[in-house]
């Protein structure tokens, strides 16, 4: 094993040789042997090996393996030095291998070491983006679970920091094709991260690009399969996929396939869906997704059939008035609860699809059923007016900070919901029914005005929906408000389904059966 002095002497030979450095193979071999020495010798070897690496192609494998030995040394300072210099080996055919190695080194739990690996990956990204991606995707597809997880997060967080000239069309196409391979077997969290990666690609900002992403989500959601309502993973998968699809829809990228699936496969089994997590009102989440998607539904093959399914589900949530006994009192101990959040979603969806078949209630629904529907509408409208008056009374005179308390924020949302329902019911009371009004769903952001707080009224909620839905609010936005009187019940809330970060049990359940990877160095 060479000493420190011998390492310096052979370094001097190579440094002084200048253009003839390649003729001093024995001197470079001495430096390679430095990895077998003590801490001082190893630190010097970690610096000297990469410096002359390119001059000795015959020793390239030996040099790279020597550096890798140092990257795995027990001494953290030696590891850091070796990793810091590793990008110098990323030349020609070696680059994908170096990228693969650096990707494996992402599993380090030492923060300084981890940052060095990130920086090294970014530096070789700028040399050859496609080659670097080859190493990353190799580990994502075949590496250990911890390496896979960190490689995906690297792509999701670091890609956006790269200059535009690096992410060429060829690179974008490569990312898309490799991502599709990965998506055959992903967890929920991984799927969300890949949608983040793909949605940011320049090539996929066009209408055709967005359509490709929608098709990708459609495959992941399993729209060709029958939904098993008893399997929480299947329900979770559907909900997470839909949340990724919603921001992609527009007037040119339609949600028809998804809305059709919801009407045909999900609505009939809505009440039997198993919640994917405690505290999730899965029925409400499904109905909110359907409402958001319905705005972008194109021509539908089975429109009348699906409108019927939607209509029947709406009837389930709109109770008949209680029967009265001779003295005029209600025969029941309590009047039916009015589930405003559900009805807002169902009415909105029905209103959106009804525009495509405006004579549905007149020509496609029999007279008795239509009469029953109008009775339910009238009863709901009466309860609605009572609720709106109560809410306006409690909010009267409040502005600014007073409206920012949790209780008042919930009441404001409740007022949005009831105003929306009021507008939609008025449309359906027209003869013939009208589908002209537009409302902004209660959980969607409203446009700010220069004059400050908007006055809460039917008019304020009757605004055009945004062309592109936004990502749902975070977990803490769940809002439930019970009316003061206790007579009318409202499950009132903004979209509350949080991104759980994975399907139950992670990979190996729900979205595929990836087993644990082998441990140890696989360079």
From Swiss-Prot:
Biological function: May be an antiapoptotic factor.
GO molecular function: fibroblast growth factor binding; RNA binding
Subcellular location per the Swiss-Prot or TrEMBL entry: Nucleus
Domain of life where this protein originates: Eukaryota
Family statement drawn from the similarity comment of this UniProt entry: Belongs to the API5 family.
Positions of short motif Nuclear localization signal: 454-475
Protein's GO biological process: apoptotic process; negative regulation of apoptotic process
Start-end of Gly residues biased regions: 502-515
Protein name per UniProt: Apoptosis inhibitor 5-B
Disulfide bonds: none
Keywords assigned: Apoptosis, Nucleus, Repeat
GO cellular component: nucleus
Region (ARM-like and Heat-like helical repeats): 1-360
Organism: Xenopus laevis
């Amino acid at each position: 094993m060479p000493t420190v002095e011998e390492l310096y002497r052979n370094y001097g030979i190579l440094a002084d040789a200048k253009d003839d450095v390649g003729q001093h193979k024995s001197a470079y071999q001495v430096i390679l042997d430095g990895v077998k020495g003590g801490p001082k010798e190893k630190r010097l070897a970690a610096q000297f090996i990469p410096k002359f690496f390119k001059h000795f192609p015959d020793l390239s494998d030996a040099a790279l393996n020597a550096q890798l030995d140092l990257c795995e040394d027990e001494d953290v300072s030696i590891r850091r030095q070796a990793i810091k210099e590793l990008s110098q080996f990323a030349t020609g055919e070696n680059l994908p291998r170096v990228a693969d190695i650096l990707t494996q080194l992402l599993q380090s739990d030492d923060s300084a070491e981890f940052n060095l690996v990130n920086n090294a990956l970014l530096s070789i990204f700028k040399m050859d983006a496609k080659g670097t991606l080859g190493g990353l995707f190799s580990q994502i597809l075949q590496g250990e679970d911890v390496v896979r997880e960190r490689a995906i997060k690297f792509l999701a967080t670091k890609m956006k920091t790269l200059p535009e000239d690096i992410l060429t069309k060829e690179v974008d196409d490569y990312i898309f094709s490799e991502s599709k391979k990965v998506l055959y077997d992903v967890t929920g969290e991984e799927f969300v991260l890949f949608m983040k990666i793909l949605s940011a690609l320049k090539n996929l900002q066009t209408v055709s690009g967005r359509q490709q992403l929608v098709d990708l989500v459609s495959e992941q959601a399993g729209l060709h399969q029958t939904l098993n309502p008893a399997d929480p993973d299947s329900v979770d998968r559907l909900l997470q996929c839909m949340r990724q699809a919603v921001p992609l829809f527009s007037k040119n990228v339609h949600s028809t396939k998804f809305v059709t699936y919801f009407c045909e496969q999900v609505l009939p089994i809505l009440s039997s869906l198993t919640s994917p997590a405690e505290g999730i009102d899965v029925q409400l989440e499904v109905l909110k997704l359907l409402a958001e998607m319905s705005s972008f539904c194109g021509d539908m093959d089975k429109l009348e059939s699906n409108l019927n399914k939607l209509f029947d589900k709406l009837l389930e949530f709109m109770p008949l008035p209680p029967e009265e006994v001779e003295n005029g009192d209600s025969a029941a101990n309590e009047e039916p609860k009015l589930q405003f959040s559900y009805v807002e979603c169902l009415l909105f969806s029905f209103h959106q699809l009804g525009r495509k078949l405006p004579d549905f209630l007149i020509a496609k629904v029999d007279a008795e059923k239509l009469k029953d529907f109008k009775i339910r509408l009238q009863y709901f409208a009466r309860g609605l007016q009572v609720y709106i008056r109560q809410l306006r009374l409690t909010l009267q005179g409040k502005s600014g900070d007073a409206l920012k308390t949790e209780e008042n924020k919930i009441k404001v949302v409740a007022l949005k919901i009831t105003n929306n329902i009021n507008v939609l019911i008025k449309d359906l009371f027209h003869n013939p029914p009208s589908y002209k009004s537009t409302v902004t769903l209660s959980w969607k952001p409203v446009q700010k005005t220069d004059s400050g707080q908007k006055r809460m009224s039917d008019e304020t909620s009757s605004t055009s929906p945004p062309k592109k839905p936004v990502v749902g609010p975070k977990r803490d936005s769940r809002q439930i408000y019970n009316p003061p009187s206790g007579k009318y019940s409202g499950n009132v809330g903004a979209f509350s389904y949080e991104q759980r970060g994975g399907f139950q049990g992670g990979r190996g359940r729900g979205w595929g059966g990836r087993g644990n990877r082998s441990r140890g160095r696989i360079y």
